[in-house]
């Protein structure tokens, strides 16, 4: 289910408050549509606009001319190129209940039920009109105030998806959105920073600024998605008549046939459904995929598909009556950066974290956001006290995109970087973007040991953080190998360690020695690897000796390890050699059950390969499997890591994301976006019970 909007209408108590609200909304809209930045985020603006509309409904004789409720785009900056047909805005709904009210109103207006709705993504970009004369793109115009827009034809040639020449020599106007994809936005900020500029706050801000820039020393790409096709003066009469009569869905097929980029090639194409209930279901499907899309959406657009229904409904001065925007909760909000905390990870990495003025995004209160590293802070020009744009989509960790520079008051303060490790006071290695304590793992011994003892690593029951601290402070443990050298009398001498606790811990340590190599490797905390990568390395090389003997070229043969990562993994393993030797001497297992070591490289230099790929012949041989949701039945007690281990023992490969290459998605209770994407792509789905039957031979 998609979350309901969490921002109700602003409460306006009198005419003075109403006038101030109109002024604030007009100022925000003008800034937003002129340059893509605004003192209000989307939720705050929607809340203000709804409050204005509610006050005007009760005081219809006191409506001010600057009110956003009567203006296209809330009062955007005007241009001097008139539109042949007004470019209107869309009215909004925020819940299934409001959508039901809108469909009932539409049915009353046209005196019949709508039987075909077109449902597609509401792209978070800038609306433009592209005019083609005899198939050639001659002019590009912004929406402006809806009646006239700004000529931005200088941007022709920099917008992907907007062809310079159509597939047929027709005279038409194509309407759509210009935006930046996530990749284009990241590239644009890199280029902008290299040229001495402040980073853009978000992709829409970047697209708006780039589209209007006429004299800039650099160019960055943008992307166009078409959503309209109409006749111009000079269009062939037969074609003009056909465009008037086509259903909206066929109009978009015609545009795509001319070479125009539409939503059809995305994971969220426009689809036609027959009932309001099916519309809401499609809204939920698109909302579930939102976090994984390579471009921003802020809602779903629902249109009456048939031309007859659109004509009968007509349009108001601000918006068509046959279309509505079903708004989704904002994934970006503006809040203040109050402080920066510096945390030390288990490998000694010193990571900054932004402390925020609490802000609600997608139903969750966000008080912290990642800042990546000191170089990223410098690139973005962040200061304490800054208003910042915070982004969070789905389960992604919230991140600070950029400062909202025009809201600065002059009281903001520089962010002070640490001169010594905030954990142990040692020197800091600043030779790479990610700063690291010079003591490395020793700085964070307690965290490293607690991590190694965790359920998904060595699974040492009874060895939590409190017990690890006790062992370290007693001088009994200085590294992971020391755990396996502990003697009964040493443990009995500790406070709160009786005979039962001691015997249980020693038994858990004995069991940990028998864990597969993949878990031992994961427990070592090799930088650049995690649970999944540790399994791949262990199953490829089969023994720790083969891993230690591998050079960077051999390491690259492991799926997912590229040219850049391989040398660092090899170097890390070499650095850990003394610890690995001590673990082996203590009796810790150094082999991966069921795995076969790779054959040596041929004498002519050919790559070595495994004699038999791990798991060949298993029930999941050659399959890429994704697990999502809560497991039930025989799988209920398995952690996600244990599920992934099971998949790989069965010959498959575990993955965290769904794509066209996914073979199977195991969807448990509460499965959300991954299940929706699997259905969208036609990927095979299985319940936990069905999957348990499939791998029954491997379940203990």
Curated annotation (Swiss-Prot):
Q: Where is this region: Disordered?
A: 590-621
Which cysteine pairs are joined by S-S bonds? none
Which InterPro entries does this UniProt record tie to the protein?
BRCT_dom, BRCT_dom_sf, DisA/LigA_HHH, DNA_ligase, DNA_ligase_AS, DNAligase_adenylation, DNAligase_N, NA-bd_OB-fold
Q: Where is the BRCT domain?
A: 615-700
Main EC class the enzyme belongs to: ligase
Highest rank taxon of the organism: Bacteria
Q: Which UniProt keywords apply?
A: DNA damage, DNA repair, DNA replication, Ligase, Magnesium, Manganese, Metal-binding, NAD, Zinc
Q: CDD domains under this entry? A: BRCT_DNA_ligase_like, LIGANc
Into which family does the record put it? Belongs to the NAD-dependent DNA ligase family. LigA subfamily.
What role does it play?
A: DNA ligase that catalyzes the formation of phosphodiester linkages between 5'-phosphoryl and 3'-hydroxyl groups in double-stranded DNA using NAD as a coenzyme and as the energy source for the reaction. It is essential for DNA replication and repair of damaged DNA.
Q: What is this protein called?
A: DNA ligase 2
UniProt source species: Streptomyces coelicolor (strain ATCC BAA-471 / A3(2) / M145)
Gene name tied to this protein: ligA2
């Amino acid at each position: 289910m998609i979350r309901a909007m969490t921002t109700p209408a602003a409460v306006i108590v009198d005419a003075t408050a109403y006038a101030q609200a109109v002024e604030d909304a007009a100022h925000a809209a003008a800034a937003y549509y002129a340059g893509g930045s605004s003192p209000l985020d989307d939720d705050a603006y929607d809340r203000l606009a709804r409050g204005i509309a509610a006050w005007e409904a009760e005081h219809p004789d006191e409506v001010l001319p600057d009110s956003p409720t009567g203006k296209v785009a809330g009062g955007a900056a005007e241009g001097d190129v008139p539109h042949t047909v007004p470019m209107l805005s869309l009215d909004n709904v925020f819940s299934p209940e409001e959508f039901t009210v809108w469909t009932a109103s539409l049915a009353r207006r046209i005196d019949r039920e709508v039987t075909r709705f077109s449902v597609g993504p509401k792209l978070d970009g800038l609306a433009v009109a592209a005019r083609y004369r005899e198939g050639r793109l001659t002019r590009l115009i912004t929406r402006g105030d809806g009646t006239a827009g700004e000529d931005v034809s200088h941007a022709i040639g920099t917008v992907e998806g907007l062809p310079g020449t159509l597939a047929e020599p027709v005279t038409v106007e194509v309407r759509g959105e210009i935006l930046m994809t996530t990749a284009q936005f990241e590239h644009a900020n890199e280029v902008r920073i290299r040229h001495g500029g402040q980073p853009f706050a978000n992709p829409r801000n970047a697209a708006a600024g780039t589209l209007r820039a006429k004299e800039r020393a650099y160019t960055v790409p943008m992307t166009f998605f078409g959503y309209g096709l109409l006749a111009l003066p000079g269009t062939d009469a037969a074609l003009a008549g056909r465009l008037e009569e086509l259903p909206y869905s066929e109009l978009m097929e015609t545009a795509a046939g001319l070479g125009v980029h539409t939503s059809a090639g995305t994971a969220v194409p426009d689809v036609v459904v027959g009932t309001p209930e099916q519309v809401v279901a499609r809204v939920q499907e698109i909302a579930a995929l939102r976090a994984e899309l390579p471009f921003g959406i802020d809602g779903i657009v629902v249109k009456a598909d048939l031309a007859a229904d659109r004509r009968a409904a007509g349009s108001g001065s601000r918006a068509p009556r046959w279309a509505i925007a079903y708004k989704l909760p904002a994934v970006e909000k503006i809040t203040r950066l109050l402080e920066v905390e510096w945390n030390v990870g288990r490998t000694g990495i010193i990571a900054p974290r932004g402390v925020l003025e609490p802000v609600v995004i997608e139903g969750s209160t966000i008080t912290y956001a990642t800042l990546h590293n000191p170089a990223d802070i410098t690139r973005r020009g962040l200061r304490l006290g800054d208003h910042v744009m915070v982004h969070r989509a789905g389960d992604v960790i919230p991140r600070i995109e950029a400062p909202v520079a025009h809201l600065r008051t002059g009281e903001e303060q520089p962010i002070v970087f640490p001169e010594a490790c905030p954990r142990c006071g040692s020197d800091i290695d600043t030779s790479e973007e990610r700063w690291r304590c010079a003591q490395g793992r020793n700085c964070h011994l307690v965290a490293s040991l607690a991590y190694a003892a965790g359920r998904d690593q060595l699974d040492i029951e009874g060895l939590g953080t409190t017990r690890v601290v006790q062992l370290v402070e007693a001088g009994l443990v200085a590294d992971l190998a020391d755990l396996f050298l502990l003697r009964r009398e040493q443990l009995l001498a500790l406070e709160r360690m009786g005979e039962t606790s001691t015997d249980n811990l020693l038994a858990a340590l004995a069991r940990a020695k028998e864990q597969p190599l993949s878990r031992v490797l994961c427990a070592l905390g090799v930088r650049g690897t995690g649970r999944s990568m540790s399994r791949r390395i262990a199953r490829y090389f089969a023994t720790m000796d083969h891993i230690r003997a591998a050079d960077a070229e051999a390491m690259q043969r492991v799926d997912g390890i590229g040219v850049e990562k391989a040398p660092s993994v090899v170097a890390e393993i070499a650095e850990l050699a003394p610890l690995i030797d001590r673990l082996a001497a203590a009796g810790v297992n150094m082999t991966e059950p069921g795995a076969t070591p790779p054959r040596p490289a041929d004498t002519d230099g050919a790559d070595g390969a495994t004699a038999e790929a791990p798991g060949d012949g298993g029930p999941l041989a050659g399959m890429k499997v994704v697990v999502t949701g809560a497991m039930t039945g025989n799988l209920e007690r398995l952690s996600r890591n244990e599920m992934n281990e099971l998949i790989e023992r069965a010959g498959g490969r575990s993955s965290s994301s769904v794509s066209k290459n996914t073979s199977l998605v195991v969807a448990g209770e509460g499965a959300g976006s991954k299940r929706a994407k699997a259905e969208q792509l036609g990927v095979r789905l299985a319940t936990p019970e069905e999957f348990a039957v499939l791998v029954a031979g491997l379940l203990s």
